[in-house]
Regions:
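Terminal and domain-flanking low-complexity segments
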Residues: 104-129
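Generic intrinsically disordered, low-complexity segments enriched for polar/acidic and small residues
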Residues: 16, 28, 51, 105-108
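Anionic N-terminal interaction surfaces
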Residues: 1-45
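Phosphoinositide-binding peripheral membrane targeting modules
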Residues: 22, 31-87, 92-101
Length: 129
């Protein structure tokens, strides 16, 4: 029998779906903090869908995570993302990358960068901004 940790990516993905618009699906996600010190600051689930990026406030509960509310939502089409020096930059704000979520963070950044490149290519082909 396989037991998932309470704050596993699969569980976070299922819980995050409740905060999305009805016709959206989780394409990539990660978990990060705005704190430089463990136990301080706020934690966030960052979810990319087909159209939007959601930054959802997360509370640590026991050994798991409870998602609380959408802190920020912005269109994926104009978004930027990159990793740098233990952090993840999304547009103009930076969150601290958590070591346990490195693979998911890399996949999230790749998804956002790929989506931005596709949107840019469509604008060049169609001439529509």
């Amino acid at each position: 029998m396989h037991i998932q940790p309470k704050n596993s990516p699969d569980k976070l993905r299922r819980n995050a779906a409740a905060f999305l618009e009805d016709d959206e699906h989780v394409q990539a996600l990660t978990y990060a903090t705005n704190s430089l010190v463990a136990g301080r600051g706020a934690n966030f689930a960052i979810v990319a869908t087909e159209r939007n990026i959601y930054v959802i406030v997360a509370h640590m509960v026991g050994l798991g995570t409870r998602l609380h509310k959408v802190n920020n939502k912005f269109p994926l089409s104009g978004a930027t993302a990159k990793r740098s020096d233990g952090g993840i930059w999304i547009n103009d704000f930076c969150l601290k990358e958590l070591p346990r979520w490195r693979e998911e963070t890399a996949a999230f950044v790749d998804y956002v960068v790929g989506a931005a490149q596709k949107a840019s290519s469509r604008r060049e082909v169609t001439g529509v901004a």
